[in-house]
Amino acid sequence: MNPNQKIITIGSVSLTIATICFLMQIAILVTTVTLHFKQYECDSPANKQVMPCEPIIIERNITEIVYLTNTTIEKEICPKLVEYRNWSKPQCKITGFAPFSKDNSIRLSAGGDIWVTREPYVSCDPGKCYQFALGQGTTLDNKHSNDTIHDRTPHRTLLMNELGVPFHLGTRQVCIAWSSSSCHDGKAWLHVCVTGYDKNATASFIYDGRLVDSIGSWSQNILRTQESECVCINGTCTVVMTDGSASGRADTKILFIEEGKIVHISPLSGSAQHVEECSCYPRYPGVRCICRDNWKGSNRPVVDINVKDYSIDSSYVCSGLVGDTPRNNDRSSSSYCRNPNNEKGTHGVKGWAFDDGNDVWMGRTISEDSRSGYETFKVIGGWSTPNSKLQINRQVIVDSDNRSGYSGIFSVEGKSCINRCFYVELIRGREQETRVWWTSNSIVVFCGTSGTYGTGSWPDGADINLMPI
């Protein structure tokens, strides 16, 4: 090869290598620009929000490092867009209930600073469940705990902790309240907090940590609400509130709330005669509530709420095995779906049930006369057949020798269905246990399961003789 040919060959090879390097640099540049401007896909439309990181809100806080030759590129991961919950999935098919959580608050109070509470409940945001209760403004081992049997004082506040975390001194006080309800619409928490004088109380509506709206007493007789979770569908939250006699005719209204603002109020309609302390659950496209008739019936009222047109209907659970306390024994109790049964209707206790096709799952105290023991079961035809009494899948949650109290429902959305869970309030102290001067509670929580399960009893478990007086 002569010198000229060598020069041409070397030049050709050099040009080829230079071309390849140039193309590689272009590819790297294009990749860099593409990944850099990919972040603009993260921009949210006006009606979207960025999922907050807890406890400090940091958006786009995850960085993935990608190495290309000697170039380092930072690729931002888009934050998850948050939308309103619609609860459109079907209800989970269950065989019964399995243990989920127990906070042991009273036992822990024997040696620690734990709040005095009552009226607990559970509610979940899309990622986590929380327990709520109405605190008495004092811990148990504190002289202020004397005489905390009273329901309504200006010191009571709504407490909120992760489920399973007892209400210790670091617990957040969400609002001032002696009656409350809370729910998460998919974007933020709504808290309904009632406080004030019996004859002129105020309900405050707190959304995303801000006071947005309020309403005053409309019947001047202890404005009160659910003492369990409200329900939000597509941004509209519903809460049942009652003002009026606890043992006679009262004025019940259903409030529709959007981001903390009252947008509509519907009066109770249908055949229910008295409605208090409703336990509500999403039944897409509406909301269904099982409540307490404190006047005429030991069968539980049903309130059906249409979220789209604000219409309301009401009736009673058809099951002849009724859910309130006090009640007749199962042989003589009755319910015919439309009206109160007029069987030991005066007084009562907050409770729950939910429909399962034509059947009904329900919980109640084991005692017919007192808040002792707790059981769950399914009544075949209990949702559709008047006075149905065929009971299956009975479980004991708290044995009959131990105290129970209020109970309520909450719903948890899974990947393919919506599960129903419930909590039981385990009351201790006055009036029954007169060695001490306080009244407080712990809770136990169960959730629906499609699996098998065993037996047991999950009472509060504190030895009253070891407790502060």
UniProtKB/Swiss-Prot annotation:
<feature type="topological domain" description="Virion surface">
    <location>
        <begin position="31"/>
        <end position="469"/>
    </location>
</feature>
<keyword id="KW-0325">Glycoprotein</keyword>
<feature type="disulfide bond">
    <location>
        <begin position="318"/>
        <end position="337"/>
    </location>
</feature>
<dbReference type="InterPro" id="IPR001860">
    <property type="entry name" value="Glyco_hydro_34"/>
</dbReference>
<feature type="disulfide bond">
    <location>
        <begin position="280"/>
        <end position="289"/>
    </location>
</feature>
<keyword id="KW-0378">Hydrolase</keyword>
<keyword id="KW-0479">Metal-binding</keyword>
<feature type="region of interest" description="Hypervariable stalk region">
    <location>
        <begin position="36"/>
        <end position="88"/>
    </location>
</feature>
<feature type="active site" description="Proton donor/acceptor">
    <location>
        <position position="151"/>
    </location>
</feature>
<feature type="region of interest" description="Head of neuraminidase">
    <location>
        <begin position="91"/>
        <end position="469"/>
    </location>
</feature>
<keyword id="KW-1032">Host cell membrane</keyword>
<dbReference type="GO" id="GO:0016020">
    <property type="term" value="C:membrane"/>
</dbReference>
<comment type="subunit">
    <text>Homotetramer.</text>
</comment>
<dbReference type="GO" id="GO:0020002">
    <property type="term" value="C:host cell plasma membrane"/>
</dbReference>
<keyword id="KW-0946">Virion</keyword>
<keyword id="KW-0812">Transmembrane</keyword>
<keyword id="KW-1133">Transmembrane helix</keyword>
<feature type="glycosylation site" description="N-linked (GlcNAc...) asparagine; by host">
    <location>
        <position position="200"/>
    </location>
</feature>
<feature type="glycosylation site" description="N-linked (GlcNAc...) asparagine; by host">
    <location>
        <position position="86"/>
    </location>
</feature>
<keyword id="KW-0326">Glycosidase</keyword>
<feature type="binding site">
    <location>
        <position position="371"/>
    </location>
    <ligand>
        <name>substrate</name>
    </ligand>
</feature>
<feature type="glycosylation site" description="N-linked (GlcNAc...) asparagine; by host">
    <location>
        <position position="146"/>
    </location>
</feature>
<feature type="binding site">
    <location>
        <position position="292"/>
    </location>
    <ligand>
        <name>substrate</name>
    </ligand>
</feature>
<comment type="function">
    <text>Catalyzes the removal of terminal sialic acid residues from viral and cellular glycoconjugates. Cleaves off the terminal sialic acids on the glycosylated HA during virus budding to facilitate virus release. Additionally helps virus spread through the circulation by further removing sialic acids from the cell surface. These cleavages prevent self-aggregation and ensure the efficient spread of the progeny virus from cell to cell. Otherwise, infection would be limited to one round of replication.</text>
</comment>
<keyword id="KW-0472">Membrane</keyword>
<feature type="topological domain" description="Intravirion">
    <location>
        <begin position="1"/>
        <end position="9"/>
    </location>
</feature>
<dbReference type="GO" id="GO:0055036">
    <property type="term" value="C:virion membrane"/>
</dbReference>
<feature type="disulfide bond">
    <location>
        <begin position="183"/>
        <end position="230"/>
    </location>
</feature>
<feature type="glycosylation site" description="N-linked (GlcNAc...) asparagine; by host">
    <location>
        <position position="61"/>
    </location>
</feature>
<feature type="binding site">
    <location>
        <position position="297"/>
    </location>
    <ligand>
        <name>Ca(2+)</name>
    </ligand>
</feature>
<feature type="binding site">
    <location>
        <position position="293"/>
    </location>
    <ligand>
        <name>Ca(2+)</name>
    </ligand>
</feature>
<dbReference type="InterPro" id="IPR033654">
    <property type="entry name" value="Sialidase_Influenza_A/B"/>
</dbReference>
<feature type="region of interest" description="Involved in apical transport and lipid raft association">
    <location>
        <begin position="11"/>
        <end position="33"/>
    </location>
</feature>
<feature type="glycosylation site" description="N-linked (GlcNAc...) asparagine; by host">
    <location>
        <position position="234"/>
    </location>
</feature>
<feature type="disulfide bond">
    <location>
        <begin position="92"/>
        <end position="417"/>
    </location>
</feature>
<dbReference type="GO" id="GO:0004308">
    <property type="term" value="F:exo-alpha-sialidase activity"/>
</dbReference>
<keyword id="KW-1015">Disulfide bond</keyword>
<keyword id="KW-1043">Host membrane</keyword>
<comment type="similarity">
    <text>Belongs to the glycosyl hydrolase 34 family.</text>
</comment>
<feature type="disulfide bond">
    <location>
        <begin position="232"/>
        <end position="237"/>
    </location>
</feature>
<dbReference type="GO" id="GO:0046872">
    <property type="term" value="F:metal ion binding"/>
</dbReference>
<protein>
    <recommendedName>
        <fullName>Neuraminidase</fullName>
        <ecNumber>3.2.1.18</ecNumber>
    </recommendedName>
</protein>
